[in-house]
Amino acid sequence: MGFCFSKFGKSQTHEIPISSSSDSSPPHHYQPLPKPTVSQGQTSNPTSNPQPKPKPAPPPPPSTSSGSQIGPILNRPMIDLSALYDLHKELGRGQFGITYKCTDKSNGREYACKSISKRKLIRRKDIEDVRREVMILQHLTGQPNIVEFRGAYEDKDNLHLVMELCSGGELFDRIIKKGSYSEKEAANIFRQIVNVVHVCHFMGVVHRDLKPENFLLVSNEEDSPIKATDFGLSVFIEEGKVYRDIVGSAYYVAPEVLHRNYGKEIDVWSAGVMLYILLSGVPPFWGETEKTIFEAILEGKLDLETSPWPTISESAKDLIRKMLIRDPKKRITAAEALEHPWMTDTKISDKPINSAVLVRMKQFRAMNKLKKLALKVIAENLSEEEIKGLKQTFKNMDTDESGTITFDELRNGLHRLGSKLTESEIKQLMEAADVDKSGTIDYIEFVTATMHRHRLEKEENLIEAFKYFDKDRSGFITRDELKHSMTEYGMGDDATIDEVINDVDTDNDGRINYEEFVAMMRKGTTDSDPKLIR
């Protein structure tokens, strides 16, 4: 028989049956949750709008004159967004800005644009938070369950973040509309959620605000994938650092957050709360106010006995228990959760997934050799802040802590990210990234091969890379300068030099000027280029 939880607010009176055990199990009801949040500044997510297919490649950044004003947020020349995109209807509004639907003027494709008012970024911390959000979006884009980031643009009044438009609405809105689903369907949804946590942690990011509202459906199709959005509270993981600020949304906050002493394990807790809600319709710890919710979380009484739990599999309940263990050191990891029997026994699709790291390495393999060396120069000059996430990814792959990644470590690391590449394909990636042909990938080579191509938007990075080759500061890279620089890496043979010059020297004067160099570096910089994804 059905039942209804009305403790979430007197205004919610409708009952929606959801079958969560098997197709024949008795239905239970999903009661929409109120949204008490701990932190401010959350922007609303886009709702139903058409989603273009296939996924487009970003246009090259618009040219800017040397006299362009440098924006204080992004530290690069300011750009008039209206030259690139038309803004349309408002999709959501938050403390700092507004999200609009927008259209790319070059091809008519639709995206979401989060416009943040610079005058509302009063504190230095506000600016640092926005910069970090941009860096994390750049770092994580390309993952199958993370919203695609198109670019960040700054003008006199606003910072604009352009990203994929997810037109299917919020995850739980879809569940409410559907009315019922099976435990198997819940597992299919939940695997995507846990995969986001796993990939974030593997790539050195803790989300800190996982909740159903931050997962959107790509389209209105029945089998639409879901995407994680809103990384405004996310941070790069710093080895040994303990976080003390209370962030997140009340129902999903881990107990150690309330104790102001936590790490990445809080994301697993939040995901566990989401699974509990998926299977029961209510959160495990509830209250009428934030205070009473927090008290329930700290008290920690987990109910897996009363209805509907007798109809739900022991395997599902075992996973919930392991994700909601109060001691974060004993809590299951996201990687372990993905291997839990409840996740693996439901015959979820085994379709290969291309991780962002893998896609970038495939791109890198396709680049000409001058571009590879130039990227290495850029990588060597990036700040610790800019490569924080990649540093953690490298450490996760370098399992023997030797300071280099072997073929076996690369293969195992890509496998943990969901790759199904063959031995020969991984060998090709290895050879492409191993610039000095040592047989292993060192830290700089790894950063070179996997850093996000948004780094190429920074003029100062391109200038420094050009100077590395232009030894006499003539404004041109001559054949001799090219040969000298490339010989250091065993690439200085005449055939390679001819190949590079023929590819880059578009005005056929036998040398490479700065404009030709920049065009080469910015060519094909999307992480979603279908030609580079197998």
Curated annotation (Swiss-Prot):
The active site is at residue 209. The modification Phosphoserine is found at residue 249. The keyword Calcium applies. Pfam families: EF-hand_7 (PF13499), Pkinase (PF00069). Residues 16-27 have a biased composition (Low complexity). Ca(2+) 3 binds at residues 470, 472, 474, 481. The keyword Ribonucleoprotein does not apply. ATP binds at residues 91-99, 114. A lipid is attached at residue 2 (N-myristoyl glycine). Its EC number is 2.7.11.1. Activated by calcium. Autophosphorylation may play an important role in the regulation of the kinase activity. Residues 85-343 form the Protein kinase domain. Its main location: membrane. One of its GO terms (cellular component) is mitochondrion. CDD domains: EFh, STKc_CAMK. Ca(2+) 4 binds at residues 505, 507, 509, 511, 516. GO terms for molecular function: ATP binding; calcium ion binding; protein serine kinase activity; protein serine/threonine kinase activity. Keywords: ATP-binding, Calcium, Kinase, Lipoprotein, Membrane, Metal-binding, Myristate, Nucleotide-binding, Phosphoprotein, Repeat, Serine/threonine-protein kinase, Transferase. This is Calcium-dependent protein kinase 29. It comes from Arabidopsis thaliana (Mouse-ear cress).
